[in-house]
Amino acid sequence: YEKDDPKTVYYMSMEFLLGRALGNNLINMTAYKEVKEALEEMGIDLNVIEDQEPDPALGNGGLGRLAACFLDSLATLGYASYGCGIRYRYGMFKQKIRDGYQVEAPDNWLKDGNPFELRRPEYAKEVRFGGNIRVEYDETGKTHFVQENYESVMAIPYDYPIVGSVSYTHLTL
């Protein structure tokens, strides 16, 4: 669809409850059975490999699942589209009840890396937090806003493929 220069959908969400990628991608590419059989011939159990993959801790609950389903549908239908969200290094968080109180802890889902994502440092952007805004005017009278005394981080994007079901298309989260 790139050569036709279509309109593009950018689906933005604070969370995407994706689920595990390996099995889902193999199913969507109609390759699950073949890969499972090929691995079995080598004495490898695909289910054991699948169990090693943590859930991407990019969301929880119904809205995160809905966002992931929208991406899956867009990829399956072949729409030119992207998912845009936050890659939480330590996940949203894990919740436990201890001694009658809710306790939150980080979800270190990236401790062993993520083979399904591609780091894109060439597109890194500075993101500024806090500080104050000073207004300046240039010689033509045009207003310019200058942010001062801020904290900044470098936001590095990661591409994460969302494979469409039996469609030979994918989109990027």
Model regions and ranges:
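Conserved alpha/beta enzyme-core scaffolds, especially Rossmann-like or related mixed alpha/beta domains
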Residues: Y11, I44-N60, Y79-I86
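Conserved small/polar residues in nucleotide/adenosyl-binding loops
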Residues: T169-L173
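Flexible loop/turn segments at secondary-structure boundaries
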Residues: L18-R20, R65, Y88-I97
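Conserved oxyanion/phosphate-binding beta-strand-loop segments in alpha/beta enzyme cores
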Residues: Y1-E50
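Conserved phosphate/anionic-ligand binding catalytic regions in large, soluble enzymes, centered on
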Residues: G62-D72
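Short linear interaction motifs
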Residues: I49-P56, R65, S152-P157
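Extended, Lys/Arg-enriched charged tracts that mediate electrostatic binding to polyanionic substrates
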Residues: G91-Y168
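Glycine-rich phosphate/pyrophosphate-binding loops
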Residues: F70-D72, T76-K94
